[in-house]
Swiss-Prot record:
Record protein name field: ATP synthase gamma chain
Family note: Belongs to the ATPase gamma chain family.
Keyword hit for Cell membrane: yes
Gene label: atpG
PANTHER family the record matches: ATP SYNTHASE GAMMA CHAIN, ATP SYNTHASE SUBUNIT GAMMA, MITOCHONDRIAL
Protein source organism: Mycobacterium marinum (strain ATCC BAA-535 / M)
MF term (GO), any: ATP binding
InterPro entries: ATP_synth_F1_ATPase_gsu, ATP_synth_F1_gsu, ATP_synth_F1_gsu_CS
Length: 304
């Protein structure tokens, strides 16, 4: 019985130590998520406006750019998977990987070979363990991505897409490095309690032609539409990648805050249950000791 009591007290101490760690992680995530949300909210208007500008340019001008033209027989599709660098964030990464696998299956059904690009150590470890060929990876900034990180990633993706569009000097030589489509898998932040894993195509761009109810607005482009489009295009793709990483960063912190709060609450419940069991064991031990003392006293009295 004493051994059981010592074991219960040891488990209570262990649960208390774990609770301190999870509580600290919860507080850290809570303090960081406000900054992540602020960065996300400040970036969204710019991303929306540049998307609207490029859509207007493409819809109002006869542009023939590789990023607007569908490949006649797409064979390779680049997929950028945005994950986290650290764990302890619930099902955040598992949901990203599940959505990625769904996209890979869809691409294969369409006769396209997925070409994998990853952001975050978790995705790098996940796909390396499964012997995936990773075209390129970026790590170390999942919680606090910078615009420079997004620019580097977007540049790599655009270079691969341009090779697939026949912009390279030797298309046959560069075939293994080229892609005909660009997709991104990330986690969209909706609120502290709601995030959804999304898979979206970045290139070729999908131009939406919207019918105007009133008189049609005529635009005059200075410089010409093609020059303006090519000037804005790198910023557009970088902004798309940057916005996705900001969404994922806020989602990661929200998932970690929820996961750590749940772990802290579970530790509290476990400590209460173990404390109750320990008290019962202690009470039983005391009762047994009293019974032994009374029994010994009665035996001495009978002996007299």
């Amino acid at each position: 019985m004493a051994a059981t009591l010592r074991e219960l007290r040891g488990r209570i101490r262990s649960a208390g130590s774990i609770k301190k760690i999870t509580k600290a992680q919860e507080l850290i995530a809570t303090s960081r998520i406000a900054r992540a949300q602020a960065r996300l909210e400040s970036a969204r208007p710019y991303a929306d406006q540049i998307t609207q500008m490029l859509t207007t340019l493409a819809a109002d001008a006869a542009l023939d750019h590789p990023l607007l033209v569908e490949h006649p027989q797409p064979k390779r599709a680049g997929v950028l998977v945005v994950s986290s660098d650290r764990g302890l964030c619930g099902a955040y990464n598992a949901n990203v990987f599940r959505r990625s696998e769904e996209l890979f299956s869809l691409l294969r059904d369409e006769g396209k070979q997925p070409v994998l690009y990853v952001v975050g150590r978790k995705a790098l470890a996940y796909y390396t363990f499964r012997n995936w060929d990773i075209a390129q990876s970026w790590t170390g900034f999942s919680e606090q991505p910078k615009y420079e990180n997004a620019a580097e990633i977007a540049s790599t993706l655009v270079d691969a897409f341009m090779l697939g569009a026949g912009e390279g000097e030797d298309q046959q030589t560069n075939n293994e490095q080229s892609v005909d489509e660009l997709h991104i898998v990330f986690t969209e932040f909706k609120s502290m309690l709601s995030q959804s894993t999304e898979a979206r195509r970045m290139a070729p761009m999908v131009v939406e032609y919207v019918e105007e109810t009133g008189p049609r607005t005529l635009y005059s482009f200075e410089p010409d539409a093609t020059t303006l489009f090519e000037s804005l295009l790198p910023r557009y793709l970088t902004t798309r990648v940057y916005a996705a990483m900001l969404e994922s960063a806020a989602s990661e912190l929200a998932s970690r805050q929820r996961a750590m709060k749940s772990a802290t609450d579970n530790a509290d419940d476990l400590i209460k249950a173990l404390t109750l069991m320990a008290n019962r064991e202690r009470q039983a031990q005391i009762t047994q000791e009293i019974s032994e003392i009374v029994g010994g006293a009665n035996a001495l009295a009978d002996a007299r």
